[in-house]
């Protein structure tokens, strides 16, 4: 992908980074877009987002394959459209942000079904991610975090916070939740990372298929014996009873495993990095852990590591003077919506005392992230323990020297070297 320095002005605002921009695009009021849009700062959305939100919050754009799409960047528009029943998530209708998109048309995951099928399927998983179940899981997460920090401090006074803490923590939690062998972590971590890199193309598709095959073998093993105590076993048991199909179990196992460790690991790492850049907030949270729940929501808003939700219109939609036609693709810029001045005062500032719960980091509407309660709890436990156990934590490299994961659907850094 070209860098943000390649952006050129158009007649209606700016061009997002892309390999292609021509007079026809500009005359038509379109901008070309390459995905994911490059971030040049780990703490800010792509620099073009603010201008888009201010000047053209519902904007026409052109994707890598020439397909037209609408970019939605203001929060009121994001919420209205994501909750609109005329907006679909069916993969066959979605805009393709990269060559690896659009290959899951037969999938039956929570992120590929529209109502009413989506609601019926989601109902099978809600108890596993409700507040009661998350409270029950908290002691187990605390045990994992304590063990990892014990190992970390016993080995010395330096570490890579991502590789040595955040990723093992998130992986152990999802392995316990699903009842997946932790010793297989290298295999599924590598494939998940590859599958979430849009630019990887065929390699991303191959990694996704290998991840599916791996989980299919685990599911088949549980089908012929005791299904076990984890969520995967519970899904298999429901399939035995006719409540779920094999495709339901497999497709959602892939979703839960992939989303359940990489995103959380990146969010923990990036959250620590943000707090290290704001020593006053770090000290306040060390003294008053009761501020952590609010700080977690502010971190989710401020970082917005998952961006670019895809949808399509199933009927004509009139919104704020624009007509979105049936069949049009939509891309929701969540990172832009989470910096909306109409919703958050001084949105570019990081403020653990603000009420940030109105963020859309988990999406919005019927497909809002099912695991958000678990994610919040993991962040609270992990950050609280780091603040308590490693109060003198510091990065051992300049932020400018960190390698950013700008080629991934889940933004983050490749490593975070720290000392204490």
From Swiss-Prot:
Pfam families: p450. Keywords: Antibiotic biosynthesis, Heme, Iron, Metal-binding, Monooxygenase, Oxidoreductase. Heme binds at residues 118, 122, 311, 367, 369. Its EC number is 1.14.15.34. It catalyses: 20-oxo-5-O-beta-D-mycaminosyltylonolide + 2 reduced [2Fe-2S]-[ferredoxin] + O2 + 2 H(+) = 5-O-beta-D-mycaminosyltylonolide + 2 oxidized [2Fe-2S]-[ferredoxin] + H2O. Pathway: Antibiotic biosynthesis; tylosin biosynthesis. Residues 1-28 are annotated as: Disordered. InterPro entries: Cyt_P450, Cyt_P450_B, Cyt_P450_CS, Cyt_P450_sf. Transmembrane segments: none annotated. It comes from the Bacteria. One of its GO terms (molecular function) is oxidoreductase activity, acting on paired donors, with incorporation or reduction of molecular oxygen. One of its GO terms (biological process) is antibiotic metabolic process. Belongs to the cytochrome P450 family. Involved in the biosynthesis of the complex macrolide antibiotic tylosin. This is 20-oxo-5-O-mycaminosyltylactone 23-monooxygenase. The lineage of its organism: Bacteria, Bacillati, Actinomycetota, Actinomycetes, Kitasatosporales.
């Amino acid at each position: 992908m070209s860098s943000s320095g390649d952006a050129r002005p158009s007649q209606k605002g700016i061009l997002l980074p892309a390999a292609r921009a021509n007079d026809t695009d500009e005359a038509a009021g379109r901008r070309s877009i390459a995905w994911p849009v490059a971030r040049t700062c780990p703490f800010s959305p792509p620099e073009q987002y603010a201008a888009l939100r201010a000047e053209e919050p519902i904007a026409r754009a052109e994707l890598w394959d020439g397909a037209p799409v609408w970019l939605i960047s203001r929060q009121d528009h994001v919420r209205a459209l994501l909750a609109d029943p005329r907006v679909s998530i069916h993969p066959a209708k979605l805009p393709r942000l990269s060559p690896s998109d659009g290959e899951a048309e037969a999938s039956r995951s929570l992120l590929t079904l529209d109502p009413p099928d989506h609601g019926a399927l989601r109902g099978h998983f809600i108890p596993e991610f409700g507040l009661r179940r998350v409270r029950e899981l908290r002691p187990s997460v605390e045990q994992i975090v304590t063990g990892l920090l014990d190992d970390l401090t016993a080995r010395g006074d330096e570490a890579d916070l991502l590789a040595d803490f955040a990723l093992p923590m998130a992986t152990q939690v999802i392995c316990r939740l699903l009842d997946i062998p932790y010793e297989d972590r290298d295999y599924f971590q590598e494939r998940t990372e590859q599958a979430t890199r849009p630019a990887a193309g065929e390699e991303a598709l191959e990694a996704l298929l290998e991840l599916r095959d791996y989980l299919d073998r685990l599911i088949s093993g549980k089908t012929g014996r005791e299904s076990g105590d984890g969520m995967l076993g519970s899904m298999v048991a429901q399939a035995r009873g006719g409540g779920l199909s094999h495709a339901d179990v497999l497709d959602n196992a892939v979703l839960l495993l992939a989303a359940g460790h990489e995103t959380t690991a990146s969010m923990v790492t990036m959250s620590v990095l943000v707090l290290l850049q704001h020593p006053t907030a770090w000290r306040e949270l060390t003294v008053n852990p009761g501020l952590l729940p609010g700080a977690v929501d502010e971190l989710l808003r401020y970082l917005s590591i998952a961006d670019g939700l895809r949808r399509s219109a199933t009927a004509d939609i009139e919104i704020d003077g624009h007509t979105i036609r049936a069949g049009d693709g939509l891309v929701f810029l969540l990172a832009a919506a989470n910096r909306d001045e109409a919703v958050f005062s001084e949105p570019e500032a990081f403020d653990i005392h603000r009420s940030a719960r109105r963020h859309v980091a988990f999406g919005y509407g019927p497909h809002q992230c099912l695991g958000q309660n678990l994610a919040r709890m993991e962040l609270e436990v992990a950050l609280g323990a780091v603040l308590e156990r490693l109060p003198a934590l510091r990065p051992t490299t300049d932020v400018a020297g960190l390698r950013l994961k700008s080629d991934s659907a889940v933004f983050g850094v490749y490593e975070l070297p720290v000392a204490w």
